[in-house]
UniProtKB/Swiss-Prot annotation:
Cystines in this chain: none
Main location: nucleus
Name listed for the protein in its UniProt record: LisH domain-containing protein C1711.05
Species the sequence originates in: Schizosaccharomyces pombe (strain 972 / ATCC 24843) (Fission yeast)
Record-annotated membrane-spanning stretches: none
Length: 451
């Protein structure tokens, strides 16, 4: 190793990492090689694992890097402030609606409608409504007197617990809201939102988000994103669409739904329902157009899957498995696999056609390129060899078999060997051969190399 400058801070860090993980001897040799006696005494605040996972990487960067990092942090904070302002403006104090505007907005109360869109809406508890139009949207609304609407956009809005609203747009945000009647939401952003206590909702769309909501009457939803959402305690719902998401909801009256996503959702305890569509997911729940494994435990739980390869296992009494196509319950405990198979076969045909076309194009390109290559006259030692793209096997037999006693020029090797070898090659059996080649003829008119 030689001399390591102690300014780097990494040296003691490695030393302590080795000692903590039981590599005491290595730590001692490390100390000898670095020649620093204070290594063993000094304590290091940073953990090597944290350093490697880039959590605590800043202290070891150069001043320039730190400057860059500060700039990015400032821009992050600015965007955070903007999003908070927007959310404050969008939420009036009395009976708030959460809607995504600047694209034509529609809001409805006490009903759920969706028009000309890929949408999945799940509404639970009385007097709740969710509507979405002309968009890929998923909206889940729970508890009385709440409404959420999104139009002409990829949006997801969830409103839960009466008199709560959430809206925000185009920001990278981290929002945490605690205590009742609070809301945190972010769209088109990377966000981490955690909401705790009753009547809180957190939603994020088109983002990488981690949202965890705890306490009763809470919902966390994320759309078009990589998200992890976990909601615990009763009356909670977590939904994610167009995303890779993990959502786990525990305790009674909870629902988790995810669409167009890779999601893992697990709901435990009684009165829980969960939906997921167009996704690869491991869900406690239901999945449509996806490969999924779903397990729902405890009584009064439902899991439904449509148009998918899915395996669902429901444990404990009072559980149903439904298959739904476009949100409607078609039959109990049945899976529609035919439609998905048909669609895949159609896709295969299309792809094969495209492949053939591309092959034809490549072939044409080769022909045009070979003519130009062969027409070139360059003074390289291999000018006689010709164009490599024209090289082929000497005979069709060689194409199938790697070696069938035929040499590069199509002659049978075992016959020709006897002729081409010189005198010195064949001698009495017990005498040592003097060399592999002694005389004989060499074919000087070789026009191509074959491999």
């Amino acid at each position: 190793m030689g001399e390591i400058s102690m300014k780097s801070k990494v040296c003691p860090l490695i030393y302590h990492f080795l000692q903590e993980n039981g590599y005491v001897k290595t730590a001692q040799t490390f100390l000898k090689e670095t020649g620093d006696k204070d290594l063993a005494k000094g304590k290091v605040k940073k953990n090597l694992l944290d350093l490697l996972s880039q959590k605590e990487f800043l202290p070891y960067l150069t001043t320039e890097d730190v400057g860059k990092h500060k700039k990015t942090k400032e821009s992050l904070e600015k965007s955070n402030d903007d999003s908070q302002k927007i959310s404050k403006k969008g939420a009036p104090p009395e009976k708030a609606h959460s809607s995504s505007e600047a694209s034509g907005s529609g809001s409805s109360s006490d009903e759920s409608d969706s028009s000309s869109s890929e949408s999945e809406s799940s509404s639970e508890d009385n007097d709740s409504s969710s509507s979405s139009s002309d968009s890929e949207s998923e909206s889940s609304s729970e508890d009385s007197d709440s409404s959420s609407s999104s139009s002409d956009s990829e949006s997801e809005s969830s409103s839960e617990g009466s008199d709560s609203s959430s809206s925000s747009s185009s920001s990278e945000s981290e929002s945490s809201s605690e205590d009742n009647d609070s809301s945190s939401s972010s769209s088109d952003s990377e966000s981490e939102s955690s909401s705790e206590d009753s009547d809180s909702s957190s939603s994020s769309s088109d983002s990488e988000s981690e949202s965890s909501s705890e306490g009763s009457d809470s919902s966390s939803s994320s759309s078009s994103s990589e998200s992890e959402s976990s909601s615990e305690d009763n009356d909670s719902s977590s939904s994610s669409s167009d995303s890779e998401s993990e959502s786990s909801s525990e305790d009674s009256d909870s629902s988790s739904s995810s669409s167009d996503s890779e999601s893992e959702s697990s709901s435990k305890d009684s009165d829980s329902s969960s939906n997921s569509s167009d996704s690869e997911d491991d869900s406690s729940s239901d999945s449509s157009d996806s490969e999924s494994e779903s397990s729902s435990e405890d009584s009064d739980s439902t899991s439904s899957s449509s148009d998918s390869d899915s395996s669902s296992s429901s444990e404990d009494g009072n559980s149903n498995t439904d298959t739904t196509t476009s949100g409607e319950v078609s039959a109990q405990s049945s899976t529609n696999s035919t439609s998905s198979e048909e669609s895949t076969s159609v896709k295969d045909e299309d792809s094969s056609k495209i492949h053939d076309k591309s092959l034809k194009r490549k072939h044409e390109d080769d022909e045009s390129s070979t003519s130009t290559k062969s027409s070139r006259t360059t003074k390289t030692p291999f000018t006689r060899v010709g164009d490599p793209s024209q090289w082929d096997f000497a005979s069709p037999a060689l194409r199938d078999n790697s070696f069938n006693f035929e040499d590069d020029y199509g002659t049978l090797a075992n016959r020709d060997l006897i002729v081409t070898r010189g005198k010195g090659f064949r001698q009495e059996k017990n005498k040592k051969k003097r060399g592999s080649y002694r005389g004989g003829r060499i074919n000087t008119e070789v026009r191509s190399f074959k491999f």
